Each structure stands twice: as C-alpha cells, then as structure tokens.
C-alpha cells in the first residue's frame, strides 16, 4: 500500500511525528499554546537579528551610530530594530507564562524536559542581556559594567574572571566584540536545546489540565492543534505589530538614547523590565556574593521542583490553598519587578527584602501544603 511521503521520507518522518501525527491530549487548553508561541518568537528573533547583524558594527566608536543608521537609512531598518527589541519582550512574556503554566499544572514532573527548559531560560536570559549591551547607549554600557562586575564577588577567582570576561581592565571594545559574537551564536544553541526539549517531551507526551494519563483519549496534532496554534500566532503578532507601530520605545529605557559615556553614571542603573524581578532580588541582599547567589538561585530554584513533589495529584488544580499560594507568588514577582525599577532607598529596600523572602518561601512551602491537604482528605 502506498504510504504518504510524510510517513516514508526519513526527514519528513521526524517532522511528521512532531507536528502532524503527534498524539495530543484532547483537553489541553490555550495555556498549552505558549510552547509554539516561543518557537515563533525564536524564529522572529533569529530572522530580524540576522538582518540587523548585516548593518550593525561591533565597535565602541561606531556601534551607537550604526544602530542610528539602521533606523534612519536602512530600508525598513526601523521596523527590524523595533521588532527585534519588542520581540524580546514578547519572548519573555511567553516564557514566563509557559513556566507559570508548568508550575500550576505540574508539568515539571517531566523531569528531563523541565531541566532542559530551565537551561534554555538561562541561555535566553544571557542572550537578551548581551543584546541589550550592543546599542552601546548609557544603559547598555553601565548595565554591562554592573552585571559583569558581579563575577568579582566569586572568592579568589573573581577579579581574574571579570578581567578575562571584559578582555581588559574595563568594559571596552573587546567586551562589545565578544558580546556581539555570543549574542549571534547563542540563539542557535537555544534552537538546538529546543529540539532536545521537544525530544524529551515527545518521549512522555504532553501533560493536560486535569493531570491524568490521557493515552486513552488522544487526537492528532494536525489539524486540531495546528489551527489552535495559528490563532495564538495571529493574536501575538497582532499585539506585537501594534506595539511596534504605535509605541515602539514603550518598554525601552530613555537613557539608551544617549551614547555610552564611562565618565557619567546614569541616575538609576536598571536592566530591561523582564530582568527587574531578579535584579530586585540581587539588590535586596546586602552582601555582594550573597546577592549573586540569590540572583542565580531565583531562576535555578525551578530545578528543585521535580525532586520536591509530595502531592498525590499532579498540579495544583485540586489544591485550593496551593492556588492561593501560587497567585500570591505571581503577585510577589510583579511587585519585585516594580521594586527593581525603584531607587535604592527606604521603603523600597525593605519591601524588596520581604518580597524576596516570600518568593523563595513559595518553593519550600508549596509541596508541604499539598502534603498537608492530602492528609486532610484521607
């Protein structure tokens, strides 16, 4: 009997098993759209970034003006740049919603998939940080100086590491050149890690909103979820294009319109909005090394979730108290984002410290409350 090409060709077969004939749970909601939206974001970022790299110059004397040149003189350069800058914001919105979904519905119990996902998050954060340095504005330069300088907190090796990273005794041309190189290569590493993420996911199949085994009731991915994903694509692209065409600099920092000047420090150094919660956690620890450890742990703590699960049911859909804790944690992250953009003075410092404690306590208390609730039901 004649088989369709998608089932017989060795290359198409891989794509077919991942995107067409993949058995998917019948009841997955729109919260499961964010994986494909992240794939779309990554493609948008790689394509716009590729064209931007054709016109960008990684030199301290020319970088700022090359970005200016892209926006003024290159055909649709303004569109490429604003799509790329705001695309990063949408990437992080989707990634945070994707992680939130994973925490809520217990998707972290797919341990290898979850751990690869956290590694992808670290890589994406590194990529975004280095991309923010490239326009070589005031906030680019001082952000790079402050964040890379955190490595000096590492005992014994610190200063050597910082100078090795900088390529000199300060953030300068060597730093900009290597950041551009890494910013170019990392998205392709993220792409490779995404393939591994999907490979692990397809070993187990997707989770679903009730957290039960759905093998008895699955449907093919195409056409059902391809069309559902396309609806998500259209909504996200519409919002992204609206932002880009109406208010492209809304999420940026005005200080970055000033060329980098090592002799003038901005009044308030802060990263892009999607890093502010982690920046607030960093600042809330009055010790440099402690702050760096807290900064890394604020993301790395996600890795403990698969190993610290005490509940009988998957996810927190059936745990009312845990739902209150979860939404409280979400509010905590939003408030930390707000604190990260505030100056280092009272009462912001104290609020940041309290919120940091609440943030970390969530990961420790949540499994204990599920255990208590299970015991209550026995």
Curated annotation (Swiss-Prot):
Q: Where is heme b b566 bound in this sequence?
A: 98, 197
Q: Which InterPro entries match?
A: Cyt_b/b6_C, Cyt_b/b6_C_sf, Cyt_b/b6_N, Cytb/b6-like_sf, Cytochrome_b, Cytochrome_b_C_euk/bac, Cytochrome_b_N_euk/bac, Di-haem_cyt_TM
Q: How is the cofactor bound?
A: Binds 2 heme b groups non-covalently.
Q: Please report the record's description of how this protein sits within the membrane.
A: Multi-pass membrane protein
Q: Which Pfam families match?
A: Cytochrom_B_C (PF00032), Cytochrome_B (PF00033)
Per its UniProt record, the required cofactor names are: heme b
Named from the GO MF annotations, one term is: metal ion binding
The alphabetical list of record keywords is: Electron transport, Heme, Iron, Membrane, Metal-binding, Mitochondrion, Mitochondrion inner membrane, Respiratory chain, Transmembrane, Transmembrane helix, Transport, Ubiquinone
Keyword Cytoplasm carried by entry: no
Q: Gene Ontology cellular component? A: mitochondrial inner membrane; respiratory chain complex III
User: Its principal location?
Assistant: mitochondrion
Q: Where are the transmembrane segments?
A: 34-54, 78-99, 114-134, 179-199, 227-247, 289-309, 321-341, 348-368
Which cell locations does it reside in?
Mitochondrion inner membrane
Output the superkingdom of the source species.
Answer: Eukaryota
Q: Which residues bind heme b b562?
A: 84, 183
Which family does this protein fall into? Belongs to the cytochrome b family.
Cited function? Component of the ubiquinol-cytochrome c reductase complex (complex III or cytochrome b-c1 complex) that is part of the mitochondrial respiratory chain. The b-c1 complex mediates electron transfer from ubiquinol to cytochrome c. Contributes to the generation of a proton gradient across the mitochondrial membrane that is then used for ATP synthesis.
Supply any other comment.
Answer: Heme 1 (or BL or b562) is low-potential and absorbs at about 562 nm, and heme 2 (or BH or b566) is high-potential and absorbs at about 566 nm.
Subunit and partners: The main subunits of complex b-c1 are: cytochrome b, cytochrome c1 and the Rieske protein.
Q: Under which name does UniProt file this protein?
A: Cytochrome b
Q: Which organism is it from?
A: Drosophila yakuba
- Name the gene for this chain: mt:Cyt-b
């Amino acid at each position: 009997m004649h088989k369709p090409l998608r089932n017989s060709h060795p290359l198409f077969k891989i794509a077919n098993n991942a995107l067409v004939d993949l058995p998917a749970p019948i009841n997955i909601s729109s919260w499961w759209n964010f994986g494909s939206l992240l794939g779309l974001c990554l493609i948008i970022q790689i394509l716009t970034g590729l064209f931007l790299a054709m016109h960008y110059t990684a030199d301290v004397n020319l970088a700022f003006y090359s970005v200016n040149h892209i926006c003024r003189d290159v055909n649709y350069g303004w569109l490429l740049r604003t799509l790329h800058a705001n695309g990063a914001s949408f990437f992080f919105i989707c990634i945070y919603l994707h992680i939130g979904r994973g925490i809520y519905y217990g998707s972290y119990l797919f341990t290898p998939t979850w751990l690869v996902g956290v590694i992808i998050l670290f890589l994406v954060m590194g990529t975004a940080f280095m991309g923010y340095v490239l326009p070589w504005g005031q906030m680019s330069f001082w952000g790079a100086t402050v964040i890379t300088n955190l490595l000096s907190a590492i005992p014994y090796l610190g200063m050597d590491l910082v100078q090795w990273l900088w390529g000199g005794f300060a953030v300068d041309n060597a730093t900009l050149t290597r950041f551009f190189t890494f910013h170019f290569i990392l998205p392709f590493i993220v792409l490779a890690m995404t393939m591994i993420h999907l490979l692990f996911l397809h070993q187990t199949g997707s989770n679903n909103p009730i957290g039960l085994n759905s093998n008895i009731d699955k449907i093919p991915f195409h056409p059902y979820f391809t069309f559902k994903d396309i609806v998500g694509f259209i909504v996200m692209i519409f919002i992204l294009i609206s932002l880009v065409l109406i208010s492209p600099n809304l999420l940026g920092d005005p200080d970055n319109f000033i060329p980098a000047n090592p002799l003038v420090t901005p009044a308030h150094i802060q990263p892009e909005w999607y890093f502010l919660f982690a920046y607030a956690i960093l600042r809330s620890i009055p010790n440099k090394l402690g702050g760096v450890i807290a900064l890394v742990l604020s993301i790395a703590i996600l890795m403990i979730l698969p190993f610290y699960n005490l509940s009988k049911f998957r996810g927190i859909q059936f745990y009312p108290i845990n739902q209150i804790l979860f939404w409280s944690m979400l509010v905590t992250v939003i408030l930390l984002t707000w604190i990260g953009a505030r100056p280092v003075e009272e009462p912001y410092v104290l609020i940041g410290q309290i919120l940091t404690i609440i943030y970390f306590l969530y990961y420790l208390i949540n499994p204990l409350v599920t255990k208590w609730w299970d015991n209550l039901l026995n």
